[in-house]
């Protein structure tokens, strides 16, 4: 009976628990024994392995977060630590590892692969910044959370004829901001892909209020500028009350939406199948409505395609 380990790494994403449930169910089907690794790659180094049973996953498909935990472990970049992790896996008799996480996690997976450990990566990050998949686990739940929050801000902004500047997660990828902006009808969408022109933002907000609009919504990807400073500058330049809101980590939490549960289950089932057939060293993804697989090196060297269709659309729909 093959022994498979599974870990969650990086920032948590809604749907990770659905992936863990699928790993256990699929392991039963393929006659494999599944072990959970607590706290990501740190847990491998510390030998923190725990058998995952039916009961462990019987009520987690609808839960946010990850029952295995996830911690930042920068020490794993050191070759000596990677070697120790591989030795722990070999000593425990692990035949393959399932890594649920984002791009940084997949670099860790590649390190294990280079030490002879069969590894499969399953993309899970609300940032949706993994180039080898159209959508990562957690993205659509975070998107719904962002849109629901923006809808509420629109209500109060409209009541007071106010501008709201909303910071959305995503790091260097603007997908979450782009889709949240489209779905919420935001007047201005600012992402790493669009760039940031402060004067243009102020001018467009000013034009919106001159047309007697009751509100203006500006959504912007984190780390591009201080939303508090931008809100102050908009208010000073336009004389319209402006408020800044940072959605923050609320975007990572909550019960995963149906689509995240589905792709988590599909990708994890495929991942366990691959390891059961001694076929590792892959990163999985979703293309269209299919699960696809890439060699680790190929996946890590891919570039994230620009959402050209969507960006062209919002350019045409500017007020």
Feature roles, as predicted:
Residues 132-143, 255-261:
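Short beta-strand elements at the ligand-binding edges of bilobed clamshell
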Residues 226, 233-319:
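C-terminal non-catalytic interaction/assembly regions of soluble proteins
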Residues 99-101, 111, 139-241, 245:
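Accessory alpha-helical/coil subdomains and C-terminal extensions
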Residues 34-35, 113-136, 190-194, 246:
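Short, acidic/small-residue loops that bind anionic groups at enzyme active sites
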Residues 44-97, 105, 137-144, 148, ...:
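Glycine-rich oxoanion-binding loops at beta->alpha junctions
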Residues 1-45:
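N-terminal phosphate-binding or glycine-rich loops at protein starts, especially the Walker A/P-loop
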Residues 18-23, 103-117, 177:
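Short Gly/Thr/Asp-enriched flexible loops that form oxyanion-binding sites at enzyme active sites
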């Amino acid at each position: 009976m093959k022994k498979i380990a599974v870990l969650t790494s990086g920032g948590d994403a809604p749907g990770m628990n659905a992936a863990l449930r699928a790993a256990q169910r699929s392991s039963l089907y393929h006659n494999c024994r599944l072990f959970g690794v607590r706290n990501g790659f740190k847990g491998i180094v510390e030998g923190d392995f725990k058998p995952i049973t039916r009961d462990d996953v019987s009520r987690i498909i609808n839960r946010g977060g990850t029952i295995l935990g996830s911690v930042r472990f920068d020490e794993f970049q050191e070759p000596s630590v990677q070697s120790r992790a591989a030795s722990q896996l070999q000593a425990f008799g692990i035949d393959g590892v399932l890594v649920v996480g984002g791009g940084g996690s997949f670099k860790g997976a590649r390190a294990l692969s280079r030490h002879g450990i069969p590894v499969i990566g399953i993309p899970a990050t609300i940032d949706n910044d993994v180039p080898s998949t159209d959508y990562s686990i957690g993205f659509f739940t975070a998107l719904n959370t962002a849109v629901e929050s923006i809808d509420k801000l629109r209500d109060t902004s409209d009541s007071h004829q106010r501008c709201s500047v909303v910071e959305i997660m995503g790091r260097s990828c603007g997908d979450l901001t782009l889709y949240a902006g489209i779905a919420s009808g935001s007047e201005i969408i600012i992402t790493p892909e669009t760039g940031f022109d402060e004067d243009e933002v102020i001018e467009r907000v000013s034009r919106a209020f001159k047309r007697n609009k009751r509100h203006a919504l500006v959504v912007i990807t984190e780390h591009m500028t201080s939303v508090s400073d931008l809100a102050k500058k908009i208010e000073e330049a336009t004389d319209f009350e402006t408020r800044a809101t940072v959605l923050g980590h609320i975007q990572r939490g909550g019960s995963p939406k149906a689509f995240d549960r589905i792709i988590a289950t599909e990708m994890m089932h495929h991942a366990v199948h691959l390891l059961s057939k001694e076929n590792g060293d892959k990163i999985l993804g979703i293309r269209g409505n299919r699960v696809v697989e890439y060699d680790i090196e190929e996946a890590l060297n891919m570039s994230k395609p620009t959402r050209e269709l969507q960006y062209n659309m919002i350019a045409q729909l500017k007020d």
